[in-house]
Amino acid sequence: MPQQKMRIHGQYVKDLSFENPNSPFLSSSKAPDINVMVNINSAKLEGTKNKEEVNEEKSFHEITLHIEVKATVKDEGIKDGVAFICETKYCGIFSIENLKELSEEEVRQALFIGGPTFLFPFAREIIARVTSSGGFPPLMLDPIDFETMYEQQGQQQKSNGSNSNFN
């Protein structure tokens, strides 16, 4: 199996929002229920394919780690029970070298496992800071096993007879 080489060329917050709809009336001392949704998208950046001196192809991709957190509490004084909603799209620009020697599956694994694994700690810190700035204790998301997530998505697609991209 050829060795893949993946490099990051930049990372950034593409979108960030925090809603605190019941402030300053949030008086519940109950711990909120936390619901976390994670999606991963990859977009090939056009016009970035080139031939290196050693005749290797390089492909550039923007990988987006989209995390949405909704905290709810069961309290009669809180409208809709929403304590806060935090959403971020954290992106990285990655290149994959030795592209001609890699299978489509190896490229997908690099994009949907390697990329998000690199980006997650940075997105996690942003969410912790934003929730703290919103008047809540910093929300420290549990680590995510992107390899298991990728495998589960693949099994789900096989059972549905779908070959669509991993999201």
Curated annotation (Swiss-Prot):
One Pfam family in the UniProt entry: SecB
Keywords assigned: Chaperone, Cytoplasm, Protein transport, Translocation, Transport
UniProt subcellular location: Cytoplasm
GO molecular function, one term: unfolded protein binding
Gene3D superfamilies associated with the record: SecB-like
Principal subcellular localisation of the protein: cytoplasm
InterPro entries noted in UniProt: SecB, SecB-like_sf
This protein's GO CC annotations: cytoplasm
SUPFAM superfamilies, per database record: SecB-like
A GO biological-process term: protein folding
Function, as annotated: One of the proteins required for the normal export of preproteins out of the cell cytoplasm. It is a molecular chaperone that binds to a subset of precursor proteins, maintaining them in a translocation-competent state. It also specifically binds to its receptor SecA.
UniProt record similarity statement: Belongs to the SecB family.
UniProt subunit comment: Homotetramer, a dimer of dimers. One homotetramer interacts with 1 SecA dimer.
Protein name: Protein-export protein SecB
Source organism of the structure: Wolbachia sp. subsp. Drosophila simulans (strain wRi)
Gene encoding the protein: secB
